[in-house]
Amino acid sequence: MSEVPAKAKVVVIGAGIVGNCLVGHLARLGWTDMVLLDKGPLPNPGGSTGHASNFIFPTDHNKEMAFLTVDSQNQYIAAGLNNTCGGIEVARTPERMEEFKRRMTSAKAWGIDARLVTPAEIKEMVPFINEEILLGGYYTPSVSVVDSLATGTMMRDEAVGKGVLSVFANTEVLDLLTEPAEGGPRIKAVVTDRGTIEAEHVAIACGVWSPRIAAMAGANIPLTPAVHQMADVGPIDILQQSGKELAYPIIRDMDTFCYERQSAGSMEVGSYAHRPIFMHPDEIPSNEEAALSPTELPLTYEDFDPQMEQAIELMDMLGDAEIKYA
């Protein structure tokens, strides 16, 4: 196992989508002498990047967020990593339809192509949906899914190819050494199990592990890891027959805080309606201890079952399939 360099201009801790894109963009801006670290293997070190649903809905009432999302999508399109499938946010209540009308004003203001659709139009786009329980929907043709692992790999490899980045996977950060500076202590070195790196700049991009790493330097990142319930349900005949990864628009069932996203011959069903399930970063299992990955924990059915019933009400075919993994 090779040792890390003794010095670097930039050390980025975490090789998920954020860390990879950071080094890629810094390389495009002319930065050199960078090191990227992750305690897990590549290309999938074990964080959320490797298993998130990765869909992008561009409409936001906040102008900056909407423009940032559209700009990101355009970059993914240019790189050939964007899978456009469209997305429909469906309404079960009159109040939700009123919110969709408000969303239309933001979409129009920011130049995002979107329109309100009737239950019949939703049924035409998604033939297996139960339109009888819907009042309408908000359809955005540009909704897409991005391959976050492929995107991160591309950005990382681009920086490596320019000769400005060294990458060290399976390398754990043990400590951050600080020194007094104007405005408060600054990080002067990163201690790893392969050696210590003196650094001018250190970026923490570890996702759910970030608070733990920041604490090594006496800093507090106000982030609490929360478990999100998601299951892969299948196989489902109509999805298998499509022969595509994404043949149908992604559905966001806004009144039940659920989403349904095709994943080839199966359907990903995710829920945000359950109780808050928090974890301390130290409680997250290691790559060796985890059944799938450190951030893919066993489904707690008592939290997920009520939302699954609502998903089946919207798409009854889900009740005839099995949960492949969760």
Give, region by region, the residue ranges found by the protein language model:
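Beta1/beta-strand and adjacent pyrophosphate-binding region of the FAD-binding site
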Residues: 3-18, 35
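Helical element adjacent to the flavin cofactor pocket in flavoenzyme catalytic cores
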Residues: 139-201
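Short beta-strand to alpha-helix junction loop
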Residues: 67-68, 89-99, 138-160, 168, ...
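Central helical "cap/lid" subdomain
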Residues: 192-249
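Glycine-rich FAD pyrophosphate-binding loop
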Residues: 27-48
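Active-site lid/adjacent beta-loop-alpha segment flanking the redox-cofactor pocket in flavoenzymes
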Residues: 86, 220, 236-326
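Conserved Rossmann-like nucleotide-cofactor binding loop
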Residues: 18, 42, 209
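Dinucleotide-binding Rossmann-like beta1-alpha1 core, especially the glycine-rich loop
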Residues: 52-125, 255-260, 264-268, 278, ...
